[in-house]
A protein has these predicted regions:
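Solvent-exposed interhelical
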Residues: 115-126, 130-131
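Membrane-anchoring alpha-helices and their flanking helix-loop junctions
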Residues: 1-112, 116-119, 137-194
Length: 194
């Protein structure tokens, strides 16, 4: 039991590390352009979100009642396996979506004039598969590792919804005929639902 639990935990952590390294490297090859002040505002928002998340995680980690709850309730093999499965599916979705969008990927705050409408790969079914993949990864981590991640899932969901709406406004302006048609036949985050 202990070995499976540890393997699941290390698998989830390893996927997060691979995701961060891949994203950092892939960011070097995106199209440049757009409003730099918007990029700075977006970066400030992400930094604030990151600081709040880390502060909350540190606070919860130091809380003895939280720590006891975490180990009593959330450290089971079925939950760890379920969490690892969610993280794996989420990572696969995010990687596939990132590959499909290619050089068009970038910060939601940067509105590039040479943006292309990508409707292939996972974008054929959902409009924001990277956000969906990351939310699946966060949900899996909260199920398999720690309930503190639920706070992260809630904050990230709010941020992703805000970013998705902003991106959709831009894409509607950029592709006034094609994007509304694409939007009508796809869902925002969850195929056939949302």
């Amino acid at each position: 039991m202990g070995v499976i639990l540890k393997l699941c935990h290390w698998w989830m952590i390893a996927l997060w590390v691979v995701m961060m390294v891949y994203w950092a490297i892939a960011a070097l090859f995106v199209k440049r352009g757009g409003d730099r002040s918007a990029l700075r505002r977006g970066m400030r928002m992400r930094l604030l979100l990151f600081v709040v998340i880390i502060a909350t995680m540190v606070f919860l980690r130091r809380s003895s009642s939280f720590h006891a709850l975490q180990w009593a309730v959330f450290q089971s093999v079925p939950l760890a396996v379920t969490g690892a499965a969610f993280v794996t599916v989420g990572a696969a979705l995010a990687f596939t979506a990132r590959a499909a969008i290619g050089r068009n990927w970038g910060s939601p705050a940067v509105r590039k004039s040479d943006t292309e409408l990508v409707t292939s790969g996972p974008y054929k079914v959902i409009r924001h598969p990277i956000y969906s993949g990351l939310l699946l990864m966060m949900t899996g981590t909260s199920i398999g590792l720690s309930p503190a991640w639920w706070f992260v899932v809630i904050l990230a969901s709010l941020y992703f919804l805000r970013s998705a709406r902003s991106e959709e406004e831009f894409m509607t302006e950029r592709f006034p005929e094609a994007y509304p048609a694409y939007r009508a036949r796809t869902k925002m985050l969850v195929p056939f639902l949302i």
